[in-house]
């Protein structure tokens, strides 16, 4: 697993440690990862059992509570117990322009959260993120207003440093929502999906944007997406509202 710590306000991550424990060993081993001059947010770990690697990845910004600028990742060799790759990829202005929703291009990725990490046999990987946010009484929240990352629950949270394990529940009412246990009406939004592919050396190969615009009041149960990995292609399934009816797309 990973252990993350940050600024005094706990709104950014600037230190990450990988914690591993070998079978039949009593003590865990802690390795600090290199994080220099950037602030991380929404950090995840994925285990590559085929290549015996750990992939740790996160969005990052250059300033505390600043705009998301790109992707940070570290590749760790399980057998050698050492770092193989540590790098960042900065999103181009063209990609930000393509990804923007209600935000401008500079803040295009501020509402995106990691949903899936897909590992390839050649050591490359793909990252799937979705623009999700919520608002209450006309006040739209940004990523720094959520205590532990995305305002929605996601199965990817199993790999996250802020895993909901421990009785927190699956809905945002039980963990991340700042309106927990009061009577405010909350509107949830789930918008574009960004898919980014990287090679084994961490170089960005291609990106794609799936357009959608979803919202619901006091529940996120019918918005968001499901993904089917068919090997040679990814299929995305989600609801779209037409004449007050949800149509599966």
Predicted regions and their residues:
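Beta-propeller blade signature
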Residues: 13-26, 68-82, 145-167, 174-203, ...
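Extended, charge-rich low-complexity regions and/or helical-solenoid scaffolds
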Residues: 204-249
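Hydrophobic strand positions within the blades of repeat-based beta-sheet folds
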Residues: 1, 56, 127-128, 195, ...
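Short, solvent-exposed beta-strand-terminating loops
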Residues: 82-87, 129-155
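Structural signature of eukaryotic scaffold interfaces centered on beta-propeller domains
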Residues: 44-53, 107-125, 221-233, 239
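Solenoidal tandem-repeat scaffolds enriched in leucines and small polar residues
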Residues: 1-38, 43-58
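Surface-exposed loop and turn segments in beta-propeller and other repeat-based domains
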Residues: 30-39, 81-108, 205-219
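Short glycine/acidic-enriched loop and turn motifs that connect beta-strands
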Residues: 5-10, 61-65, 133-135, 241-245
């Amino acid at each position: 697993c990973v252990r993350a710590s940050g600024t005094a306000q706990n709104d950014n991550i600037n230190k990450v440690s990988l914690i591993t424990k070998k079978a039949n060993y009593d003590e865990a081993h802690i390795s600090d990862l290199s994080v220099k001059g950037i602030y991380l947010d929404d950090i995840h770990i994925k285990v590559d059992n085929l290549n015996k690697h750990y992939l740790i990845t996160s969005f990052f910004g250059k300033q505390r509570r600043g705009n998301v600028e790109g992707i940070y990742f570290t590749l760790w060799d399980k057998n050698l117990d050492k770092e193989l790759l540590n790098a960042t990829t900065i999103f181009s202005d063209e990609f930000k322009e393509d990804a923007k929703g209600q935000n401008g291009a500079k803040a295009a990725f501020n509402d995106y959260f990691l949903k899936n990490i897909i590992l390839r046999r050649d050591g490359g990987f793909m990252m799937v993120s979705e623009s999700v946010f919520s608002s209450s009484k006309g006040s739209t929240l940004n990523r720094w207003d959520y205590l532990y990352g995305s305002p929605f629950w996601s199965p990817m949270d199993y790999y996250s440093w802020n895993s909901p394990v421990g009785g927190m529940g699956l809905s945002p009412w039980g963990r991340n929502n700042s309106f927990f246990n009061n009577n405010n009406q909350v509107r949830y939004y789930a918008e574009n999906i960004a898919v980014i592919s990287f090679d084994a050396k961490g170089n960005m190969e291609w990106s794609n944007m799936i357009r959608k615009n979803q919202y619901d009041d006091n529940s996120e149960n019918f918005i968001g997406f499901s993904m089917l990995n068919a090997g040679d292609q990814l299929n995305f399934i989600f609801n779209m509202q037409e004449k007050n009816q949800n149509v599966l797309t």
